[in-house]
Amino acid sequence: WTMGHMVNKKYQVDEFADLGANAIEFDVTFDSNYKADYTYHKVPCDCGRTCGRYEVFTEFLSYVKNETTPGHPSFREKLVLLQLDLKMSYLSESQSNEAGKDMAKKFLNYYWNRGSNAGRAYILLSIPSISNYLFLTGFKQQLKTEGYEQYLDKVGVDFSGNEDLDSIVNVLGRLEDEHVWQSDGITNCWTRGISRLQDAIKKRDEDESRYGIKKVYTWTVDYYSSIRYYLRLGVDGVMTNFPNRVEYVLKEKEFSGSLRMATMDDNPWEKYVG
């Protein structure tokens, strides 16, 4: 999976898809009532990028629905995953729960269209901290309450705050969620050690728990040499500002025989067996 990073404007969806991204990551902020309001990343952000661009969240969601709905004139077949970077670390457990319920309602109304001509992409909810875990509970509860439990097949979770992996695994067990990604990374302005990333990959490969890690990705990776390095480590995904560079590297002899871009036929909630 190649996740285009900080895709917070409508036109950037097309821009990053044209560069080869099969997934986009966008930021989501919340208002004082814990409702998703904008696709916005404040200053600072990645080096070489312009911070502060945004759309109204529901308008953005409707736009990407069209981009991921077969038969729509704007449909992009290769765009198969939407990742939400949820800016909610300051919310309490109960507030996180309410935010999750609101998010589910917005997806039902503006993306899944309550079952009529719905967007088909997989959804990855990147939650900043395990202290916000009730966001996922609220999200699931709302879908079940409204009778749309089937959409849970499309939704996965990622705790993105570089927290202790054992603590994350414990929370995942309580959540009883099988659709688990694990991230590790830092802004492209800095470098980061790989010990935690290697530990996440090891847990993915060795932990047979039903609620264990299924995919591991790293962020934000922009240099060709770094992309090669992380692919050799065994990541499933790379978040980048330059999806075309990942696409280029995947075509190189070293990787072309064993790795390729994921498609809609690839289940993001299952471990890859190469």
UniProtKB/Swiss-Prot annotation:
<comment type="function">
    <text>Dermonecrotic toxins cleave the phosphodiester linkage between the phosphate and headgroup of certain phospholipids (sphingolipid and lysolipid substrates), forming an alcohol (often choline) and a cyclic phosphate. This toxin acts on sphingomyelin (SM). It may also act on ceramide phosphoethanolamine (CPE), lysophosphatidylcholine (LPC) and lysophosphatidylethanolamine (LPE), but not on lysophosphatidylserine (LPS), and lysophosphatidylglycerol (LPG). It acts by transphosphatidylation, releasing exclusively cyclic phosphate products as second products.</text>
</comment>
<keyword id="KW-0204">Cytolysis</keyword>
<keyword id="KW-0800">Toxin</keyword>
<dbReference type="GO" id="GO:0005576">
    <property type="term" value="C:extracellular region"/>
</dbReference>
<keyword id="KW-0456">Lyase</keyword>
<keyword id="KW-0325">Glycoprotein</keyword>
<keyword id="KW-0443">Lipid metabolism</keyword>
<feature type="disulfide bond">
    <location>
        <begin position="47"/>
        <end position="189"/>
    </location>
</feature>
<keyword id="KW-0442">Lipid degradation</keyword>
<dbReference type="GO" id="GO:0031640">
    <property type="term" value="P:killing of cells of another organism"/>
</dbReference>
<keyword id="KW-1015">Disulfide bond</keyword>
<keyword id="KW-0479">Metal-binding</keyword>
<feature type="binding site">
    <location>
        <position position="27"/>
    </location>
    <ligand>
        <name>Mg(2+)</name>
    </ligand>
</feature>
<dbReference type="InterPro" id="IPR017946">
    <property type="entry name" value="PLC-like_Pdiesterase_TIM-brl"/>
</dbReference>
<feature type="active site">
    <location>
        <position position="5"/>
    </location>
</feature>
<dbReference type="GO" id="GO:0016829">
    <property type="term" value="F:lyase activity"/>
</dbReference>
<protein>
    <recommendedName>
        <fullName>Dermonecrotic toxin LspiSicTox-betaIII1 B</fullName>
        <ecNumber>4.6.1.-</ecNumber>
    </recommendedName>
</protein>
<dbReference type="GO" id="GO:0090729">
    <property type="term" value="F:toxin activity"/>
</dbReference>
<feature type="binding site">
    <location>
        <position position="85"/>
    </location>
    <ligand>
        <name>Mg(2+)</name>
    </ligand>
</feature>
<dbReference type="Pfam" id="PF03009">
    <property type="entry name" value="GDPD"/>
</dbReference>
<comment type="similarity">
    <text>Belongs to the arthropod phospholipase D family. Class II subfamily.</text>
</comment>
<feature type="disulfide bond">
    <location>
        <begin position="45"/>
        <end position="51"/>
    </location>
</feature>
<keyword id="KW-0460">Magnesium</keyword>
<dbReference type="GO" id="GO:0016042">
    <property type="term" value="P:lipid catabolic process"/>
</dbReference>
<dbReference type="GO" id="GO:0008081">
    <property type="term" value="F:phosphoric diester hydrolase activity"/>
</dbReference>
<dbReference type="InterPro" id="IPR030395">
    <property type="entry name" value="GP_PDE_dom"/>
</dbReference>
<keyword id="KW-0354">Hemolysis</keyword>
<feature type="binding site">
    <location>
        <position position="25"/>
    </location>
    <ligand>
        <name>Mg(2+)</name>
    </ligand>
</feature>
<feature type="glycosylation site" description="N-linked (GlcNAc...) asparagine">
    <location>
        <position position="66"/>
    </location>
</feature>
<keyword id="KW-1061">Dermonecrotic toxin</keyword>
<dbReference type="GO" id="GO:0046872">
    <property type="term" value="F:metal ion binding"/>
</dbReference>
<feature type="active site" description="Nucleophile">
    <location>
        <position position="41"/>
    </location>
</feature>
<keyword id="KW-0964">Secreted</keyword>
